[in-house]
Curated annotation (Swiss-Prot):
Disulphide bonds in the chain: 32-82, 36-59, 42-64, 46-66
Predominant location category: secreted
Domain remark from Swiss-Prot or TrEMBL: Has the structural arrangement of an alpha-helix connected to antiparallel beta-sheets by disulfide bonds (CS-alpha/beta).
Source organism: Tityus obscurus
GO cellular component: a single term: extracellular region
Function: Inhibits voltage-gated sodium channels (Nav).
GO molecular function: ion channel inhibitor activity; sodium channel regulator activity; toxin activity
Protein name: Toxin To7
LCN-type CS-alpha/beta domain: residues covered: 21-83
Tissue: Expressed by the venom gland.
Amino acid sequence: MSIFPIVLALLLIGLEETEALDGYPLSKINNCKIYCPDDDVCKWTCKHRAGATNGKGDCIWYGCYCYDVAPGTKMYPGSSPCYA
């Protein structure tokens, strides 16, 4: 039996969920969602890291998940910005 399938499976499991540059995990479903431990951190993360605003500079978040990433924002190296 080859060890290759086992190694490949472990790699794929590890790639299911990645971390953003600030260490918070990106959602598996929608990279626009950013988990934050509390409202203050969530607001700061939306405004400074994700650029998640309503076009007026106000941060948009719900349940400590940030949405509506501004155009041109890089969520993770090599990935395109997403729009909620």
